[in-house]
């Protein structure tokens, strides 16, 4: 699935019936969300609203509204192929030297992909075809959506924020929502553990009082966007990973007002800075939890330049109670996580983040248990191995005879293989999502692990039950006469 930029990708989607153009005027205030939500719940196409009311710029929604389109954005034909992306990431996270000539030959495709990792810097780029600076900067000209009735203000949702710490060569790319508060002002809502916030804190320590340069790309190519939400190893830049996905080097261009590099083919680039100490109350906003979050203070992003392509497209989304676009992304990225976890914990058979659990708050793991206490080791590993699971509140561990993606199976294991006192692990005072208002303290709460595996000697003193298994010979005999019985005819 080869493409160069967002527009190229939209052409591919349209050819496959995965894009619908909406010519009827629709309001970015609430109406686009209503249409996008109904479409996503029905498994429908990406939507390009060509005539948003009050604006000259079209709005793109539901780009990643199905797992298939997420896979297409990662250069794959179907979701199952995302396991290969996970295997590549696992290899890059902990590369192993070839064990011999045959192993070297087997690894050649991976080494060949690595050649696409370096970025290609352009002198001029499509994203700088039109330039606004100074008093000409006006964010209110963008068709920024208001998604829910009680949202505080229009909200940029798919902004790809580019930052760099003072002592780093590698840039960080992150998706952080941004509240519109003026013609050239946005609130940058990044949590303290995220890459952009860490870069900012390092900047404040190294250069106190100096403005922190920031750029935000809107409408980047899907590989670059997905690179920012995928568990990329800390030693690998999101741009490099995007090159691996796309099969070509990521093209970047130096921003006009700072030394950051932005995606050259992005539709819109916002350039500016964060003034140390300039904060503003952000929210409330309806979020992926299905609730409005509480108001809190975050840094203000001052925009000094807006550069864009001719006939630019504004890329947006909404977040709400699952299913929403982040939940769909979670379903697809789940396949990427499995090989990464399996490389560290080979005993893991499957790993599942149910979308109804807000994509990351509950995980189900199935494993080949090998000794007493093994399930507890795995649950601790899930919480600690990847930072993406730092906020996972519940981890359920089952044996490999259980289907992690079938609640009937999982609930059967919980109710037949668990003693609540013995098999429940509670860990207090751990990092918790700021949006989780159920936690007693903002950003700090507890976690629960459920060991729903068969118990081994040392874990129980009782004779353990044997699962009922049908006689295969009887099953075969009944299969042979089933149609003749005509029970359902």
Curated annotation (Swiss-Prot):
Disulfide bonds: none annotated. Its cofactor is prenylated FMN; Mn(2+). One of its GO terms (molecular function) is metal ion binding. Its EC number is 4.1.1.98. Mn(2+) binds at residues 172, 238. Its main location: membrane. GO terms for cellular component: cytosol; plasma membrane. SUPFAM superfamilies: FMN-binding split barrel (SSF50475), UbiD C-terminal domain-like (SSF143968). It catalyses: a 4-hydroxy-3-(all-trans-polyprenyl)benzoate + H(+) = a 2-(all-trans-polyprenyl)phenol + CO2. Binds 1 prenylated FMN per subunit. Prenylated FMN binds at residues 175-177, 189-191, 194-195. It holds the Pfam family UbiD_C. GO terms for biological process: ubiquinone biosynthetic process. It is a peripheral membrane protein. The active site is at 287 (proton donor). Pathway: Cofactor biosynthesis; ubiquinone biosynthesis. It is an enzyme of class 4 (lyase). It is found in: Cell membrane. Homohexamer. Catalyzes the decarboxylation of 3-octaprenyl-4-hydroxy benzoate to 2-octaprenylphenol, an intermediate step in ubiquinone biosynthesis. Belongs to the UbiD family. This is 3-octaprenyl-4-hydroxybenzoate carboxy-lyase. It comes from Salmonella paratyphi B (strain ATCC BAA-1250 / SPB7). The gene is ubiD.
């Amino acid at each position: 699935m080869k493409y160069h930029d967002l527009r190229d990708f939209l052409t591919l989607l349209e050819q496959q019936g995965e894009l619908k153009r909406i010519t009827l005027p629709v309001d970015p205030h609430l109406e686009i969300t209503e249409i996008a939500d109904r479409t996503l719940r029905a498994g429908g196409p990406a939507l390009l609203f060509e005539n948003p009311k009050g604006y000259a710029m079209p709005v793109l929604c539901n780009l990643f509204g199905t797992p298939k389109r997420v896979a297409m954005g990662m250069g794959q034909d179907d979701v199952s192929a995302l396991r290969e992306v996970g295997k590549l990431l696992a290899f890059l996270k902990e590369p192993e030297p070839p064990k011999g000539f045959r192993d070297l030959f087997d690894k050649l495709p991976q080494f060949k992909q690595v050649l696409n990792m370096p970025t290609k810097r352009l002198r001029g780029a499509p994203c700088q075809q039109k330039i606004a600076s100074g008093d000409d900067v006006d964010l209110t000209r963008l068709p920024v959506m208001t998604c829910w009735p009680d949202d505080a203000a229009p909200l940029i949702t798919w902004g790809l924020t580019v930052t760099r710490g003072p002592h780093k060569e590698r840039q960080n790319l992150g998706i952080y929502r941004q509240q519109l508060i003026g013609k050239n002002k946005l609130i940058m809502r990044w949590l303290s553990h995220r890459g952009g916030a860490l870069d900012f804190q390092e900047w404040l320590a190294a250069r106190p009082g100096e403005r922190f340069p920031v750029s935000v790309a809107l409408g980047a190519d899907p590989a670059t966007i997905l690179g920012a939400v995928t568990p990329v190893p800390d030693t690998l830049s999101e741009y490099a990973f995007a090159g691996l996905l796309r099969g070509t080097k990521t093209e970047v261009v130096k921003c006009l007002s700072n030394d950051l590099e932005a995606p050259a083919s992005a539709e819109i680039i916002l350039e500016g800075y964060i003034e140390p100490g300039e904060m503003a109350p952000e929210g409330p906003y309806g979020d992926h939890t299905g609730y409005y979050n509480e108001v809190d203070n975050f840094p203000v992003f001052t925009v000094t330049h807006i550069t864009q392509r001719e006939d630019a497209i504004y890329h947006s989304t909404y977040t709400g109670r699952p299913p929403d676009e982040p939940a769909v992304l979670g379903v697809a990225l789940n396949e990427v996580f499995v090989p990464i976890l399996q490389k560290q914990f080979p005993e893991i058979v499957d790993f599942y983040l149910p979308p109804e659990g807000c994509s990351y708050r509950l995980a189900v793991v199935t494993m080949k248990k090998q000794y007493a206490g093994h399930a507890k080791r795995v649950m601790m590993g899930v919480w600690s191995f990847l930072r993406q699971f730092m906020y996972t509140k519940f981890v359920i561990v089952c044996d490999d005879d259980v289907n992690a993606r079938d609640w009937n199976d999982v609930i059967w294991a919980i109710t037949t293989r668990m003693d609540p006192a013995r098999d429940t692990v509670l860990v207090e005072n751990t990092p918790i999502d700021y949006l989780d208002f159920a936690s007693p303290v903002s950003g700090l709460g507890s976690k629960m692990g459920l060991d729903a595996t068969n118990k081994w000697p040392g874990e129980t003193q009782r004779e353990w039950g044997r699962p009922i298994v049908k006689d295969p010979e009887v099953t075969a005999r009944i299969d042979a006469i089933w149609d003749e019985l005509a029970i359902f005819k």
